[in-house]
Amino acid sequence: MRSRVGNIHMIGIGGSGMSGIAEVLINMGFTVTGSDLAAGAPVKRLLKMGAQVFIGHGADNVNDADVVVKSTAISDDNPELVKARELGIPIIPRAEMLAELMRLRTGIAVAGTHGKTTTTSLLATIFTEAELDPTVIIGGRLNTFGSNARLGDGQFLIAEADESDGSFLCLAPIITVVTNVDKDHLDFYGGQEAIDESFRKFMNSIPFYGMNVVCGDDPGVQRLLPSIKRPCMTYGLNKGNRLRGEILSCEVRSLFKVYLDEKLLGEVSLAQPGKHNVLNALGAIGVSLEAGLDPKVILSGLSNFMGVGRRFEKKGESKGILVVDDYGHHPAEIQATIETAKSCFPQRRLVVAFQPHRFTRTEALFGEFCKTFEKADELLLTEIYPASEDPIPGVNGMSLAQGIRQVSDTKVRFYPDFEMMQNELPNILKPGDLFITQGAGSIYTVGEKFLKYLEEDGEKVLKPEEITAL
């Protein structure tokens, strides 16, 4: 097959899902080229691995391609897609390429509106610790690997399944995880009924001998369970779940007991705090048990989990100001981050810098966003990150700021660009503050530049590994 498919070209190769697939393909021996609008960290990593990456999209980039893979963010009028059609080059979506890779292994697909990346990463850590040598494709950088992908020789392929455009239905996993079913990606689905139907098809697509590991605490999952015709293992914190967690503490670290059919399996100490991370860990435990792993090996693997990039990630501390970055961009995810921050650091003033992600999401969930920041002490809001979307009249950062002020006592400052926010940070942040950069776009650079500013000003900046708290 490699001799027939000489060159795989990937449009949007720097994306979280695409870059992981590209890395696995390179390690399998394929020649990979690609294009993206910027040379971010994933692109730089792929370049070091031998990929040829064009910065910017151009028709000539696909001249030598035998097959073209496109990410969900790429529009049909992209010049590379247009040229590929003219040349008769096969074009496949990212999910179909992932499905082809999954056909070669026993597939484990992790789906859900929130928690996919962390749950997939927990599984990757457990299976690696168990010496199962899995192939892994994740939507974020797993700190243990220093990457979002790895090629293994073992039978399992563990992948994050993207529901945003329904393409996760291309996958053919043996085991699935569904962390939750919430309202999101309404630009594609239109409403909750279509979202539910997509997850219903996903869960019913596994073979009769497979297993759906699903969060029984989630209202969306509860809504679907009566119509699922394939085996299901429920997990959660509530009684009635087959796999149940009992939280002992989730401040600074998460400490909890695990029960299977109300029989104690053991106790877990997870470095990542928060109730949502306990649920993510329970999902990973459920899959691991279904795969036949020894409970002691599973719990040991969880204790060695080092976290995922951009998931409540410590960036540094200086002048008593702790800087944390988090990828969450849905109201439920942001609320989980804020609750975790307040639980871990009740004595610190919480300042959140939030960059909304997509005009369609901001419009569809406007009311929820307005109520999301009530527990923050101060909110620094910037303009919406478009993610290739066209603007929607009346939907912008300023309108969101006004909406938040109407329903919340949280102090809100709006900045049309990062530079204006950056210039004011030294006057806003004080010793003892917790500063969180929040969002799926480039807001993380604000925290990084603030720490660099302090360092250049002569202040000592503690690196993440030097920070004793959390």
From Swiss-Prot:
Gene Ontology MF terms in the entry: ATP binding; UDP-N-acetylmuramate-L-alanine ligase activity
PANTHER family the record matches: UDP-N-ACETYLMURAMATE--L-ALANINE LIGASE, UDP-N-ACETYLMURAMATE--L-ALANINE LIGASE-RELATED
Pathway: Cell wall biogenesis; peptidoglycan biosynthesis
Protein role: Cell wall formation.
Protein's UniProt keywords contain Secreted: no
Taxon lineage: Bacteria, Pseudomonadati, Thermodesulfobacteriota, Desulfovibrionia, Desulfovibrionales
InterPro entries, per the entry: Mur-like_cat_sf, Mur_ligase_C, Mur_ligase_C_dom_sf, Mur_ligase_cen, Mur_ligase_N, MurCDEF_pg_biosynth, UDP-N-AcMur_Ala_ligase_MurC
Gene name as annotated: murC
The protein's Enzyme Commission number: 6.3.2.8
Disulfide pairings: none
Reactions mediated catalytically: UDP-N-acetyl-alpha-D-muramate + L-alanine + ATP = UDP-N-acetyl-alpha-D-muramoyl-L-alanine + ADP + phosphate + H(+)
Pfam families: Mur_ligase, Mur_ligase_C, Mur_ligase_M
Location in or out of the cell: Cytoplasm
Segments passing through the bilayer: none
GO BP annotation list: cell division; cell wall organization; peptidoglycan biosynthetic process; regulation of cell shape
GO CC annotations on file: cytoplasm
Annotated organism of origin: Maridesulfovibrio salexigens (strain ATCC 14822 / DSM 2638 / NCIMB 8403 / VKM B-1763)
Protein name: UDP-N-acetylmuramate--L-alanine ligase
